[in-house]
Amino acid sequence: MGKTMFKKTLLFFTALFFTALCAFSANANVIITGTRVIYPAGQKNVIVKLENNDDSAALVQAWIDNGNPNADPKYTKTPFVITPPVARVEAKSGQSLRITFTGGEPLPDDRESLFYFNLLDIPPKPDAEFLAKHGSFMQIAIRSRLKLFYRPAKLSLDPFDAMKKVVFKATPKGVLVDNQTPYYMNYIGLLHQNKPAKNVKMVAPFSQAVFEAKGVRSGDKLKWVLVNDYGADQEGDAIAQ
């Protein structure tokens, strides 16, 4: 199983409307340290670190949404604020963004809540020499989107122990994954007789999902893979009930 990567949505814009020929610029300069954000309840804030390994400075915009990837950042309402929401990251340098829970709306205290951290990396405009040579160009602003889990303080079950509490049941359509824990289980793979199941996805707390597989019977051995708190692949075995 390969590492999962967070989704990147490409947002296109043009500085000069291109005609027949158009120079192309597509560089993801700014990198986010980590692949997910865990926000423990009661903590004053959490820090997201950025690194710009490019030779040019970059402008970034950050915001949090509650599950709609198409939501306009100006109108997205979540109980978090990011400081600063817009920042210039100098070449070969880093930048820290501070996420603070405002408590503007009550969240469940018996399970995790899921939000998404967004970062839009806007590349710098080409210099005069580039424009003189190409005349027109197209830039791509790269948007990175990471899961942000708000974790209540009263959850006594360790998240790694919770992985072992999930029950897998044989069904005519495949495997029913029954997650009766307070944590999101971000599955990326399930093997039955060395064959990968389909429709493998994240399963929310106290909910179920069916992973499609053929011929699964009670007593069959299964192997699952999910992404843990550290962004690493976590493997485990289970017996279908």
UniProtKB/Swiss-Prot annotation:
It comes from the Bacteria. The keyword Signal applies. One of its GO terms (cellular component) is outer membrane-bounded periplasmic space. GO terms for biological process: cell wall organization; chaperone-mediated protein folding. It is found in: Periplasm. Keywords: Chaperone, Fimbrium biogenesis, Immunoglobulin domain, Periplasm, Signal. Pfam families: PapD_C, PapD_N. Residues 1-27 form the signal peptide. Transmembrane segments: none annotated. Belongs to the periplasmic pilus chaperone family. Mediates assembly of pili by forming soluble multimeric complexes with pili subunits as an intermediate step in the assembly process. This protein is involved in type B pili (HifA) assembly. This is Chaperone protein HifB. The lineage of its organism: Bacteria, Pseudomonadati, Pseudomonadota, Gammaproteobacteria, Pasteurellales. The gene is hifB.
